[in-house]
A protein has these predicted regions:
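Active-site- and interface-proximal helix/loop "cap" or "latch" segments in soluble metabolic
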Residues: 47, 52-54, 58-121
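Structured beta-strand/loop patches that form or line metal/cofactor-binding pockets in enzymes
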Residues: 21-60
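Contiguous domain-boundary segments centered on the initiation and propagation of an alpha-helix
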Residues: 1-35, 98, 116
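Conserved small/polar residues in nucleotide/adenosyl-binding loops
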Residues: 128-129, 133-135
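Catalytic cores of large soluble enzymes that bind and process phosphate-bearing ligands
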Residues: 3, 84, 123-127
Length: 136
């Protein structure tokens, strides 16, 4: 299996599985995101131990790509600090906008790098809206 097939499988698995699509009863951070150009809406819900993210989930509706991207990022940010999650969101948005991103930065994205070929899709940017509020 080549990398493109692996990336496609990651996206399909998260789009179909939706294991991270649920409310967190004990979330201490809830960040909404809305994309007026396509109508996608999510609420990213996080449980932290003060600084580290110990659980992540989301609710909302949108296309398969936005739902899969949010689900993958939920998996990716667990165990990270809020600042690290914000940095990952910045790298992710630069990646999908085809801006300069180093190999070292791409490694930080984990499975979220699967979206590298989803260029300039506004629904993927919705995730950035929610994650960008974390560093407050």
């Amino acid at each position: 299996m080549n990398m493109e097939e692996i990336y496609s499988q990651i996206i399909l698995d998260h789009s179909r599985n939706q294991a991270n699509k649920h409310e967190l009863a004990d979330a201490d951070i809830k960040e909404p995101g809305h994309n007026p150009s396509c109508g996608d809406e999510i609420v990213l819900e996080l449980k932290t131990d003060g600084e580290k993210i110990v659980d992540a989930a989301f609710t909302g509706d949108g296309c398969a790509i936005s739902q899969a991207a949010t689900s993958v990022m939920c998996d990716t940010i667990i165990g990270k600090s809020k600042e690290e999650a914000k940095e990952m969101a910045d790298i992710y948005i630069r990646m999908i906008k085809r801006e300069e991103v180093s190999d070292e930065e791409l490694e930080k994205l984990g499975d979220a790098v699967a979206f590298i070929n989803i260029q300039n899709m506004p629904q993927s940017c919705l995730l950035y809206t929610s994650l960008s509020g974390l560093a407050r």
